[in-house]
Amino acid sequence: MSCQQSQQQCQPPPKCTPKCPPKCPTPKCPPKCPPKCPPVSSCCSVSSGGCCGSSSGGSCGSSSGGCCSSGGGGCCLSHHRRRRSHCHRPQSSGCCSQPSGGSSCCGGGSGQHSGGCC
């Protein structure tokens, strides 16, 4: 067997495998955190017409559709649309001046139903 024939029969050495394993693909978007919801006892929903709990003291703001900030246990705000007016009347907010639980707590306790209260 000649030298040239022996070189043709030889195969190239196998490729070396990498020592480090390939990195896992990182997700493009981070996992979304669940929205922070207020506890059920501290805030009320406007659609249900419920009132704030006595422990909360009306801590929910009007921007979030919560309860009145003045007075503990106030009622929810009404569904009325905000009018484009620079003047803010006390009855337009839909808050109750009396504590929750009464049928006449809407409209500043005068018995006028303004909606959204107990």
Curated annotation (Swiss-Prot):
InterPro entries found in the cross-reference section: LCE
Known partners and oligomeric status: Interacts with CYSRT1.
Annotated tissue distribution: Skin-specific. Expression was readily detected in adult trunk skin, adult arm skin, fetal skin, penal skin, vulva, esophagus and tongue. Not expressed in the cervix, rectum, lung, colon, or placenta.
Record lineage: Eukaryota, Metazoa, Chordata, Craniata, Vertebrata
Biased composition (Gly residues): 104-118
Disordered: annotated span: 1-23, 87-118
Keyword Translocase: no
GO process annotations (BP): keratinization
Pro residues bias locations: 11-23
Stretches with biased composition (Low complexity): 1-10, 90-103
UniProt similarity note: Belongs to the LCE family.
Function: Precursors of the cornified envelope of the stratum corneum.
Protein name: Late cornified envelope protein 1C
Induction of the gene: By UVB.
Annotated keywords: Keratinization
Note: Belongs to the LCE cluster present on 1q21.
